[in-house]
Amino acid sequence: MLFRSKAFSHSLNQLNEGDELLIQFPMLHHSFFTTSLVKKARRRGVKIYFIIHDLDALRFMNGQAVPLKHRIRMKIQESGLLGAADGIIAHNPIMKSVLVDKGIAEDKIVSLGIFDYLIPNFEEKTGLSKNQPIIVAGNLAQEKAGYLYSLPAEPAYNLYGVGFDESRALENENYFGSFLPDELPAALEGGFGLVWDGDSAETCSGVFGEYLRYNNSHKASLYLASGFPLVVWKQSALSHFVLENGCGIAVDSLHELKATIDNLSDTDYQDLLESTKRIGKGIRDGHYLLTALNNLK
């Protein structure tokens, strides 16, 4: 850890007054030393910004897998390091409010809205309909996506990713295997992309499910950039973005999903597709990060 702190210190020392540095958070290796190094760089006139990918103290605050003393240490380190920055890019207004509650100045924080997702050689999907299977991409293991093993009989689901227990596959699940990130968008087939975590189809539950109340899942950006409207948990932070931008639907339970889709007219679905195309282009163009960076200054 000391070696890594020295390496980070050496990198910061290469920067001069007026230089700006954007750091992805959480850093792979950080400690209490990191906060003092950031403060030292700022005193020399270097601007330090963080873009948040995860808040581990928030993600694991109720999880028993992480010992209490480690959770307390995590919380102190996160608050100290983020508080030392010139500016922070949070996922959304809900995450921003959590950071303000931690004592970080509100005017230092901007909301990203949604993560960008660059797709080389993008080709627009055609022939999409509301009755095609629901797409689930990502970590399909029991501990992350246990709900996959207790889904209602309808609608059908197309699964892409690692960790899926094929011996427990349901009749309405089609597993396509895993793909390289650049190959995945072209491989996806379906009518909606699902953002759901936890062990229950009734609601998003457990450490990963509860975390959706605060964070923006990267898979949401994958789906939208690929041209698919979203299905999200109604209590997730992401539901606000989805409903305000008309790029998907929100449900409390996956047991409601078939009826919700059935109640959509073909015109309703086409409207979702048009909004998804608009949002997806912005995501592929890097619009959301560029806007957030401009709003920091």
Question: Where are the model-predicted features located?
Answer:
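A charged, aromatic-enriched C-terminal amphipathic alpha-helix characteristic of glycosyltransferases
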Residues: 126-127, 252-297
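A short, active-site helix/loop in glycosyltransferases that binds the activated sugar's phosphate group
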Residues: 60, 80-109
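Short N-terminal targeting/anchoring amphipathic segment
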Residues: 12-33, 46-49
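Membrane-proximal helix-turn-helix segments that form the acceptor-binding/catalytic region
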Residues: 10, 39-43, 67-88
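Active-site proximal beta-strand in glycosyltransferases
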Residues: 20-22, 41-61
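Nucleotide-sugar-dependent
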Residues: 186-226, 232-240
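Conserved catalytic-core segment of nucleotide-activated headgroup transferases in glycan assembly
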Residues: 115-189
